[in-house]
Every structure is written in structure tokens, then in C-alpha cells.
Amino acid sequence: PQFGLLVTHNEAISIADYYTVKGENGKPEFRPTAHYAYHPCNSAVVSLDEMFGNAGSKPRKTHVLHPEEILDGADELGVLLYGHKKNAYWFGSTLHVEEAVKLAPLQNATGLQVTSAVLAGMVWALENPKSGIVESDEMDFRRCLEIQKPYLGTLKGHFTDWTPLSGRPGLFAEDIDTSDPWQFRNVLVH
């Protein structure tokens, strides 16, 4: 399980749009829910807690870490597809800081994985000049992944029996839906 922050992200909207099934009347009969969740490093989480504990006021003094200050760790970037017959499948990449610095000395693992997508988009645009402006979902994912692979670290996929109900309820009663583990209220942490 991962405790993450839900963040607005274009793919969370475009993926849901792409897989929406409309009925004869044009209204959606099925629309999947797509979330973008992010969990910053522990120091950043503490900083966010302090900021929100201070009514959301930005601290007077801030410090952005430079790549040489990040000594250890990895960035895991992936997708969890859930709610199907095999329960859930995670596919993603793990890029360790040491590997990121070897590939691009002034980068970190998170930055390198993100900028690899920008590079793939630029190459795709150069190779498809007549396509115009498109959503990232409309690009050839195989070609993009081919460009990105050297910058993503280890790519893995595996099935899991984990659900948001695993280990719940805990010490206190919760408002959870035990009939369907993948309901949104089971994902939220209150």
C-alpha cells in the first residue's frame, strides 16, 4: 500500500474520457475513475505538514535540494490497474538516484523520469509533424516507451492481491464499503 496525495493531472481526466462507454442517448453508461497519486520524500511530507499546520502559509525560508544533496533513494513511477478479475496489476519503473546521476549528472530520479516523457513527446512530434497538437494518450506509447526506457530504470509488472481494505478496519471503525473494495471512499484516508 502507498499513502499518497491525489493531485490533478491531465491523464487522470483523459484516461477516464478515453475509456468512457456512452449509451445510445449519448450519456455515459460506464466511466472509469482514474487518479494520480504522488508521495513525496519524507522530508517534503514533513514540510507539507508544517505548511498546512500553518494555515497553508508558505514558509519564509525555503530550500530546493540540488541533485548532489540527494544521496539515496529511488523514484517509483507506475500505474495500478484494479477492479478486474485478477484484482490488481501494477506496472511501472524504479529509478535509483545513483543510476539517474550516471545518466544525467545534474538530474534526480524524479526529474529524469518526468523529463524522459518530454523527450519522448518531442521526438514523437518531430516524427509525426502532420499530427498537430494531440493529448499524450494519442501518441504511440510503444514508440514513446522505446525512447524513454534508457531513463526509467527497472521496468516491472506484477499482480497483487492487495486492496484498499487490506488490514482494515484498524483500531477505529471506518466508513468503508466492504461489498466492493475499489470504491473511492475506500481509497480516501480521512
Feature map (PLM): residue ranges:
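C-terminal catalytic/substrate-binding lobe primarily of soluble NAD(P)-dependent oxidoreductases
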Residues: P1-H190
